[in-house]
Amino acid sequence: MKTDIEIAQSVALKPIAEIVEQVGIGFDDIELYGKYKAKLSFDKIEAVRSQKVGKLILVTAINPTPAGEGKSTMSIGLADALNKIGKKTMIALREPSLGPVMGIKGGAAGGGYAQVLPMEDINLHFTGDMHAITTANNALSALLDNHIHQGNELDIDQRRVIWKRVVDLNDRALRQVIVGLGSPVNGIPREDGFDITVASEIMAILCLATDLSDLKKRLSNIVVAYSRDRKPIYVKDLKIEGALTLILKDAIKPNLVQTIYGTPALVHGGPFANIAHGCNSVLATSTALRLADYVVTEAGFGADLGAEKFLDIKTPNLPTSPDAIVIVATLRALKMHGGVSKEDLSQENVEAVKRGFTNLERHVNNMRQYGVPVVVAINQFTADTESEIATLKTLCSNIDVAVELASVWEDGADGGLELAQTVANVIETQSSNYKRLYNDADTIEEKIKKIVTKIYGGNKVHFGPKAQIQLKEFSDNGWDKMPICMAKTQYSFSDNPNLLGAPTDFDITVREFVPKTGAGFIVALTGDVLTMPGLPKKPAALNMDVLEDGTAIGLF
């Protein structure tokens, strides 16, 4: 069987200018990056703002196994299948981070016959958005350190600089560093650190901004440090929001590519869902909704992370809310949640499916709290048995949720036709009555308690010593009315990655808060979640190479 990259390289791509004609985008509306990639112009984005808004489908998943459950693959396959049954559809996805591509994932543009192309470009440098975000982030760091070095007019306490540098790689050695060493001409020595680019607040801002002026306003509101009298220092105090916006003026434009089946795709922005809000850009999703009748988008990791943040953080910034939520599940993941070891997942185990179903059931019930119709998509693997499939279908029927098998990795659009028809029928026959989980007026503690008890199924929330101090500080600064972005392990409903299934009788501890005042949310750090990942013992990079003719190999 061909690998993902072999399948991708076997496809005869059409020029992107030809692909986007089907959704009313002309040649003058795009800025080409070669023949097969383009950015959408500001003029076109503005021109469609008054157009009718289409139907929005959010794809999410159960708590994943370390290998992932094929959520991006399912999103792409579903969109291709919707187009095949006559629904004018676009996809709005995140763009991959190079760190995980070189680390454990080896690629993140879908898989099999459900991919966005050109996958090598998308997985590597694409149109340079990650570079622009990295540059803007580090320009801010350089200008901040220069301000301190050149007299420190704002009286910044260098011990309380909270802005970190970033790089789009998994590099644990950079988590904690000291800058300014050597001599006085090298600046003021201070502790610093690096995050991965997708954890940068500038990434979150780019993905939530609605236009250039909104981008500039959000950048100006970033808190970078505190003064010696404990007052927050903002980017606007440094007077550099204009320069940062300039660096990002092209990166904010959504990227256009295509699927194997020629479905137009907007791939733009890529914050992680365990340490950030996990959704592609508002600008890409909003624009797609005005160009197509149906838009398929996804949120990172499981529904407890990405979907919750999509619904509580991103949706209020969109012109509409989801009309349906598709929860992707695999039998192997359900068996793992049912207590089966990774080595034994290929063996039939109906009882483990029953035990692990509690994880899927909780996610279904959680999404229903938002008032949105739910469909379960079973991502089919060759090791799945008829007995396991029948058991899962019966369990889904018992909780009155629509369920369909899909084999889009192997069969492309044809493998998702039943799923597409079911999703379309649900949208046409059931109304969505979206409501947020919490209100802006709720306190930080109240918002987190609602997430922990209503979504995670936990009992109590404990706040560590630093978090308790920050609660008062954030309230005094007027930051307590913003949404909450939980930073938590993706593998469990709890903050313990080993607590699988649908655990109960557990507490969540928030150890620290990070104000993301430009993005407009507060990050609550739990467990051992890190904002700079490390590489595994055998990184995916070990299998990558390039042939003499420039052909990439080993990208999954």
Curated annotation (Swiss-Prot):
HAMAP family: FTHFS. Keywords: ATP-binding, Ligase, Nucleotide-binding, One-carbon metabolism. The gene is fhs. Pathway: One-carbon metabolism; tetrahydrofolate interconversion. One of its GO terms (molecular function) is formate-tetrahydrofolate ligase activity. It catalyses: (6S)-5,6,7,8-tetrahydrofolate + formate + ATP = (6R)-10-formyltetrahydrofolate + ADP + phosphate. The lineage of its organism: Bacteria, Bacillati, Bacillota, Bacilli, Lactobacillales. This is Formate--tetrahydrofolate ligase. Coiled coil: none annotated. Its EC number is 6.3.4.3. The keyword Ribonucleoprotein does not apply. It holds the Pfam family FTHFS. ATP binds at residues 65-72. GO terms for biological process: tetrahydrofolate interconversion. Belongs to the formate--tetrahydrofolate ligase family. The keyword ATP-binding applies.
